[in-house]
Curated annotation (Swiss-Prot):
Gene (name only): zyx-1
Organism this protein belongs to: Caenorhabditis elegans
Composition-biased stretches (Pro residues): 1-13
MF terms in GO: DEAD/H-box RNA helicase binding; metal ion binding
LIM zinc-binding domain span: 409-470, 471-529, 530-601
Name of the protein in question: Zyxin
Keyword vocabulary terms for this entry: Cell adhesion, Cell junction, Cell projection, Cytoplasm, Cytoskeleton, LIM domain, Metal-binding, Neurogenesis, Nucleus, Repeat, Zinc
Biased composition (Polar residues): 184-193, 315-333, 363-373, 382-391
Family, similarity comment: Belongs to the zyxin/ajuba family.
CDD domains noted in UniProt: LIM3_Zyxin_like (cd09357)
Subcellular localization, as worded in the UniProt entry: Nucleus; Cytoplasm; Cytoplasm, Myofibril, Sarcomere, M line; Cell projection, Axon
Record field: compositional bias (Basic and acidic residues): 69-95
KW Manganese (keyword) present: no
Record-level GO BP terms: cell-cell adhesion; maintenance of synapse structure; nervous system development; smooth muscle contraction
Length: 603
């Protein structure tokens, strides 16, 4: 089976039929004001011919790498017709009669060609420029940029030859040449006159390092009755403009530059498995007198700076005198005093060692006991009579003194060295002999036993308990938290209320006449005055320190309880008419008092 037929062409209108325009109306068209517009015809659903889909699917194919497209291959059928006169199947087409009418052969009228050179177009030039001015500019440019190098047939596109520009600027129209020609022809574009492109051109990138280019340039000859190899001739009237190329375009013949890496896998493997060792050249040794020259240069700079500072405010005569003066002592003369002896004496340190040792002794020994170590005499300054004092003797004496004082194996108690016969122990960040580490009160040996540090003095447990304060209530030693109150010392659990036995730690309390401790509620309940009316104690209100009471008829009353017994009016001596008028120890107001008197008098 051949390829599917192409899709049908658009339908043709019958001869003489004209579609009405939107801008004018036909005579048969109804008026808009009188009659409504006719309903538009029902649109038919567009259909797609199956043969057209098959034809479109058959043209779809995948192009391989470096494969030319269909348009680049000559005489290649587009897939529509296998033979020149193959008829398309009509099928059920709507315009079958019209297609058959168009398919009929018709006679064609030949148009005679015009005479030769009758209508020859001129090459387009720059309409806004004078060709003569361009020619003069090119001539002056050639004079400045003259070169003796031979003209190359291969020139890049963007590099124009001045001779070519001048040639085409002054070129007059001439008939096309027939036959062989050895001169280079340049294509002049009919759309642009500002640039001319050389006929034979190549890419500006040349890979001459990887392959040898042996291609030669061949000028293609053309004739008026035949086409060139690329079929790239275009006719404008009777003039034929030929697009000449160095060789026919064939994508399969394109030379590609070879990669300098022949095998990438081998290069990667070699780089990853080979250790490249580079020989490091040792720098040449410095000259032997380099250090001496650097020292001399540094000394010269220092001396120059010192002399510059010295001579800054002097006159010329003073500067000359300074340059010519010599030192009072020559370099060979000896110093009048012994410098080494001064250095040795400065490192003896007898005075400092004596002060450090004395300070340690005073800190470690009690104040009432004298230190048991030997006091080293202070070193006196050497005078003229002791100038010949032996340096060896001073050094040995100083070293022995320093060893005794700075030795860490010295007992703090007795000041003697700890040896194997007299072992020591470490306590309170100090070192003691075992026999010297005793209790400060009972002289009990404390080595290997528990002790208490009281004012930097070791104390045994018995002496420590005896030194503690005793509770006033239970007469026992207080080893933990204690309370001091009322001139005594108490345990927390021993300082309690005398009535309710509640601990008074952090609670207000008071004393009675027998110095018994009571809490405030128990004290008021036990010793506060009672109200004569309600028989309750009169205590201070919340937040108050003192209680308020009313005393009448040698009795105490609450403020709220001091009122008339008959009418219940609050009695107060500050308000007129509200005073208390008692009868037989009864609280009565003035009115109730008169009423009771009238009743008694009536009876």
């Amino acid at each position: 089976m051949g390829p599917p037929p192409p899709p049908p062409p658009p339908p043709l209108l019958p001869s003489g039929e004209i579609l009405p325009s939107r801008k004018w109306k036909t005579e048969d068209a109804p008026r808009r004001n009188n009659h409504p517009a006719p309903a538009p015809p029902k649109p038919s659903r567009p259909t797609v011919d199956a043969s057209a889909l098959q034809h479109a699917a058959a043209r779809l194919r995948k192009t391989g790498y470096n494969e030319p497209v269909r348009g680049d291959v000559e005489n290649l059928s587009d897939g529509r017709l296998d033979r020149p006169h193959q008829q398309l199947p009509d099928g059920d087409r709507t315009y079958r009669a019209n297609l058959q009418q168009l398919a009929q052969p018709k006679t064609r009228a030949e148009i005679p060609s015009p005479p030769t050179y009758s209508n020859q177009p001129r090459p387009l030039g720059d309409f806004h420029r004078d060709p003569n001015a361009l020619s003069q500019f090119q001539q002056s440019r050639e004079a400045l940029l003259s070169s003796t190098s031979p003209t190359s047939n291969y020139s890049p596109i963007n590099k124009f030859s001045s001779s070519t520009l001048t040639q085409y600027a002054n070129k007059s129209p001439s008939p096309p040449s027939f036959g062989n020609s050895n001169s280079e022809a340049t294509y002049v574009s009919p759309y642009s006159s500002k640039h001319s492109y050389p006929t034979n051109f190549r890419s500006y990138h040349k890979d001459d390092d990887y392959f040898n280019n042996t291609a030669t340039t061949a000028t293609t000859t053309t004739s008026s009755n035949s086409l060139n190899e690329n079929n790239n001739s275009n006719k404008y009237g009777n003039k034929e403009t030929v697009l000449q190329w160095s060789e026919p375009y064939d994508p399969s013949k394109i030379r590609r530059s070879q990669s300098p890496i022949r095998n990438a896998r081998e290069m990667i493997h070699e780089y990853s498995t080979t250790n490249y060792v580079t020989e490091v050249q040792q720098p040449p040794p410095p000259p032997p007198d380099l250090y001496q020259r650097m020292t001399q240069a540094r000394t010269f700079l220092q001396n120059s700076l010192a002399k510059q500072l010295r001579d800054e405010g002097l006159t010329e005569s003073q500067k000359a005198a300074n340059r010519n003066q010599t030192g009072a002592l020559s370099a060979s003369s000896s110093i009048p005093f012994d410098a080494s002896q001064i250095v040795k004496n400065s490192y003896n340190g007898d005075e400092v060692d004596h002060l450090v040792h004395q300070m340690r002794t005073k800190l470690n020994q009690p104040a009432d006991t004298s230190p048991s170590i030997v006091q080293y005499p202070r070193r006196q300054a050497p005078d003229s009579s002791r100038a010949n004092y032996s340096a060896t003797t001073s050094t040995s004496f100083s070293s022995s003194t320093t060893r005794k004082i700075m030795n860490i194996n010295i007992c703090v108690g007795c000041g003697k060295e700890i040896t194997g016969d007299q072992p020591g122990c470490n306590a309170m960040n100090q070192i003691f002999h075992v026999d010297c580490f005793k209790c400060g009160q009972c002289s009990k040996t404390l080595a290997g036993a528990s002790f208490y540090n009281i004012d930097d003095k070791p104390t045994c447990e018995g002496c420590y308990q005896n030194s503690l304060e005793k509770c006033t209530a239970c007469n026992r030693a207080i080893s933990d938290k204690l309370l001091r109150a009322c001139g005594g010392v108490y345990h927390v659990n021993c300082f309690v209320c005398f009535s309710c036995k509640k601990s008074l730690d952090g609670i207000p309390f008071t004393l009675d006449k027998d110095n018994n401790v009571h809490c405030v509620p128990c004290f008021h309940d036990k010793f506060a005055p009672r109200c004569a009316l309600c028989s309750k104690p009169i205590v201070p209100q919340d937040g108050e320190k003192e209680s308020v009471r009313v005393v009448a008829m040698d009795k105490s009353f609450h403020v709220d309880c001091y009122k008339c017994e008959d009418c219940g009016m609050q009695l107060s001596s500050k308000l007129e008419g509200q005073g208390c008028y008692p009868i037989d120890n009864h609280l009565l107001c003035k009115t109730c008092n008169g009423n009771r008197l009238r009743v008694v008098s009536s009876t």
